[in-house]
From Swiss-Prot:
Its EC number is 1.14.99.46. GO terms for molecular function: alkanesulfonate monooxygenase activity; monooxygenase activity; uracil oxygenase activity. SUPFAM superfamilies: Bacterial luciferase-like. InterPro entries: Luciferase-like_dom, Luciferase-like_sf, Pyrimidine_monooxygenase_RutA, SsuD_RutA_monooxygenase. Induction: Up-regulated by the nitrogen regulatory protein C (NtrC also called GlnG) and repressed by RutR. This is Pyrimidine monooxygenase RutA. It catalyses: uracil + FMNH2 + NADH + O2 = (Z)-3-ureidoacrylate + FMN + NAD(+) + H2O + H(+); thymine + FMNH2 + NADH + O2 = (Z)-2-methylureidoacrylate + FMN + NAD(+) + H2O + H(+). It comes from the Bacteria. GO terms for biological process: alkanesulfonate catabolic process; nitrogen utilization; uracil catabolic process. It comes from Escherichia coli O157:H7. The FMN-N(5)-oxide reacts spontaneously with NADH to produce FMN. Requires the flavin reductase RutF to regenerate FMN in vivo.
Length: 382
């Protein structure tokens, strides 16, 4: 029997605030976000991601984001050993969509800021002003050592100093088309970028450490954070509160967008059975590699994203918050997410992206009070 899912009751003022944004974290790497031999096994392709993002756009998702990963975890599943590149993928997706916001991720150790500024301006032109950039400092040392560009372990403690200079160059070039910035990491000499973006370029980040949140508070339009636990949709609230407090120090409005995996079915029991099946097939070899890498950063503190990713509690999906249940239960839990102060959106992954987005759009989203402003849609006819 399907479990009942009581609906939250909001005032009109609450409802105006709780029109939560929904995004999809596209599977740019093989197998998405489940490190399990029991999960769907697939390679990343443009055609797959095109189908995912077009389906997300049909169901009124607000944005799509791709990460960047330059070396995987190995193991039986060869987890994330096969990856597309973020900017070129999102440029292609920008050309085959019309409404959804598109974000690519810049691994800032690999790309000079002037090149990122020009690539972003190009995708702004392709998308008609729907593009933004996610900036990451880089934590997985082997990704950069393999190319001979790891700057040394000192970088762990200086990475946000580096990123601060990086974003200042971007701001110069996007804002005025010119930069003469001089810093410890970058020296611009009458550097030029034209054309400039047609609209102000959104910059996002995923800082969870104090330094990361301070950076986001100063420079980001919003900040990603991990959800926490299984069916504990508001457990991230202290993280959102920290981000809100950091933003208050800069006088800016920087909301939190929370990462969750959705595993849904007709009933709570059926969804739970899928989740347990995935956990039973955990790729222990790949997970061991993740744990080993997470221990190499001894300088950034204990509150970083990678520390949470490697926690053995739910490492099978990198410890992102997981919502497991019937369609009604997942809708209720997402409404709870929207009730947390500072939470302005969620970034969703699915065990099966194509069917997951479809069932989300048709069976979950129509039950969500924080998405009640949207029409109810059925599957798009090809």
């Amino acid at each position: 029997m399907q479990n009942a899912a009581p609906r939250l009751t909001f005032t009109l003022r609450d409802e105006e605030r709780l029109m939560m944004k929904i995004g999809v974290f596209v599977p740019i790497g093989n197998n998405g976000w489940l490190i399990s031999t029991h999960a769907p096994q697939y390679m990343p392709t443009f055609e797959l991601n095109k189908a995912i993002v077009q389906k997300a756009e049909h169901y009124h998702f607000d944005f799509a984001l791709s990460m960047i990963k330059l070396r995987g975890f190995g193991g039986k599943t060869e987890f994330w050993d096969h990856n597309l590149e973020s900017f070129t993928l999102m440029a292609g997706l920008a050309a085959v969509t019309s409404r959804i916001q598109i974000y690519a991720t810049a691994a800032t150790l690999t790309l000079p800021p002037a090149i990122v500024a020009r690539m972003a301006a190009t995708i702004d032109s392709i998308s008609g002003g729907r593009f933004g950039v996610n900036l990451v400092t880089g934590w997985q040392k082997p990704e950069y050592e393999q190319m001979g560009i790891w700057p040394g372990d000192d970088y762990f403690s200086r990475r946000y100093d580096y990123l601060t200079e990086y974003v200042q160059v971007l701001r110069d070039l996007w804002g005025t088309g010119k930069s003469d910035f001089k810093g410890d990491f970058f020296t611009m000499n009458d550097c030029r970028v034209s054309p400039q973006p047609s609209v102000p370029m959104k910059v996002i980040c995923a800082g969870q450490s104090d330094a990361g949140m301070a950076f986001s508070a100063q420079y980001a339009d919003f900040n990603f954070c991990f959800g926490k636990g299984v069916n504990t949709p508001t457990a991230f609230a202290p993280t959102a509160a920290r981000m809100k407090q950091a933003a208050e120090q800069t006088g800016r409005d920087v909301g939190s967008y929370v990462l969750f995996m959705v595993i849904a079915d007709e009933t709570d029991d059926a969804a739970r059975a899928k989740w347990e099946h995935y956990k039973a097939g955990a790729d222990e070899e790949a997970l061991s590699w993740l744990t080993e890498q997470s221990q190499k950063d001894t300088r950034s503190g204990t509150d970083t994203n990678v520390r949470q990713m490697a926690d053995p509690t739910s490492a099978v999906n990198i410890n992102m918050g997981t919502l497991v249940g019937s369609y009604a239960s997942v809708a209720r839990m997402l409404d709870e997410v929207a009730s947390v102060p500072g939470a302005e959106g969620v970034l969703l992954t699915f065990d099966d992206f194509l069917s997951g987005i479809e069932t989300f759009g048709e069976r979950i989203q129509p039950l969500m009070q924080c998405r009640a402003h949207l029409p109810v849609l059925t599957q798009e006819v090809a």
